[in-house]
A protein has these predicted regions:
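HhH-family (HhH-GPD) DNA N-glycosylase catalytic core used in base-excision repair
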Residues: 1-117
Length: 117
């Protein structure tokens, strides 16, 4: 009679993952675009910032972060509100280029994001 392989020990795995998360929490986040949403307290702002950062997530990490920060500067202290009200500083994006994304393609994208909020 063949023996069935033993399944994963879910509680043990869960505990190991919790320990790893505690050990690594916050490490290297300062250089990662994932840090950007953590700057905002409002859940809507965090969601918008995470989405916009992910939308630019191609290329080198430093380049992604730099482009995302420039974009967020144009959106001001409450990106979700600025997009929803179409009240962001469009001229601040003049000359914006991230790989093949430029200000001409970014502006309608931001308006579409704002329309969904």
């Amino acid at each position: 009679m063949k023996r069935r392989p033993r399944g994963p020990d879910i509680p043990l795995l869960g505990e190991r993952l919790r320990l790893l998360e505690e050990e690594w929490r916050g490490r290297r986040l300062d250089s990662d675009p994932l840090e950007l949403p953590h700057r905002y307290a409002a859940p809507a702002d965090r969601e918008v910032v995470a989405f916009l950062s992910a939308s630019l997530a191609f290329g080198r990490v430093a380049s992604i972060r730099s482009s995302a920060e420039r974009l967020l500067d144009a959106l001001g202290p409450s990106p979700a509100d600025a997009l929803a009200r179409d009240a962001w500083d469009a001229p601040r994006l003049d000359g914006f280029v991230h790989r093949w994304v430029d200000s001409r393609s970014l502006r309608p994208f931001l308006r579409a994001v704002g329309a969904t909020l």
